[in-house]
UniProtKB/Swiss-Prot annotation:
Name of the gene: ybbA
Induction: Induced by Btr in iron-limited conditions.
InterPro entries tied to this protein: AB_hydrolase_fold, Esterase-like, Mycobacterial_A85_antigen
Domain of life: Bacteria
Pfam family of the protein (one): Esterase
Protein name (record): Uncharacterized protein YbbA
């Protein structure tokens, strides 16, 4: 690793900070990517990430991995019953979480580290429920985020796809990367069996709202299931599509 990883706390919220190799406080601000579920998507991807920097496939990025206090509450937009006796109900505190991140957490990051404050360079990425709430970030705060990565987003969540469909979201200059495995949800008996279908519905809704091929990507990975190793692989793909100079439809 040529950059650095460090643990921090802002208020009650813990986060992992990745600073790229050329980071300094003297140069212009670096694009900042706010990542759900702490460093789980990138802690084992740093070598690949820095290779992309070195090969100029990506500009150097600052990654901020935000630890959730309770992901079943903070990554869901409204309450819903649990799908299993093994888990508690979904708390539906997602809008409160997004407000806290947008109005409290991000300003603290921008005051203390050399990251650009330009919305078009500010990104948010997550996987599973983290991918769902990342998409809702652009619905709630469209002028705040210019890059959204929704990896295997939980669009099976009750009324999530429908809410996105009827929303007043307009594309503006934002770019949105979505991914899903072709086998996700296939063995589920609950509403999670609709993972692939609901993801395609959301993608179609965004196209109907005016998102062009240059602004919207849906990557369907053949044979992939809903698993962390596929999330991590798509994380690098998401960054390269959202921020890379040689973006293409995957």
């Amino acid at each position: 690793m040529k950059g650095s990883l460090s643990e921090h706390k802002a208020g009650n919220r813990r986060f992992t900070l990745y600073l790229p190799p050329s980071y300094s406080t003297d140069s212009g601000g670096f694009p900042a990517v706010y990542v759900q579920d702490g460093s789980s998507l990138f802690q084992n991807q740093i070598e690949l990430l820095e290779s992309a920097f070195q090969q100029q496939r990506l500009p150097e990025l600052v990654l901020i991995g935000i630890e959730p206090e309770n992901r079943l509450d903070e990554y869901t937009p409204w309450p819903a019953a649990s799908l299993s006796d093994r888990f508690t109900d979904f708390g539906g505190m997602g809008y409160h979480y997004l407000s806290d991140i947008t109005n409290q957490f991000i300003p603290l990051i921008e005051e203390n580290w050399n990251v650009t404050r330009e919305p078009q360079s500010r990104g948010m990425i997550g996987a599973s429920l983290g991918g769902l709430i990342s998409m809702f970030a652009i619905l709630k705060y469209p002028s705040m985020f210019g890059k959204i990565g929704s990896i295997s987003g939980s669009y099976w969540y009750e009324n999530a796809a429908e809410t996105i469909h009827i929303s007043s979201l307009k594309p503006g200059t934002a770019r949105v990367f979505m991914s899903i495995g072709s086998e996700e949800g296939r063995e589920k008996q609950s509403i999670q069996r609709h993972m692939l279908k609901k993801t395609k519905q959301v993608h179609q809704s965004l196209k109907e709202k005016g998102f062009t091929e240059d602004q919207l990507c849906l990557s369907i990975e053949k044979g992939a299931v809903h698993h962390h190793k596929y999330f991590c692989k798509q994380f690098i793909n998401a960054l390269e599509w959202l921020y890379g100079k040689n973006r293409s439809t995957l």
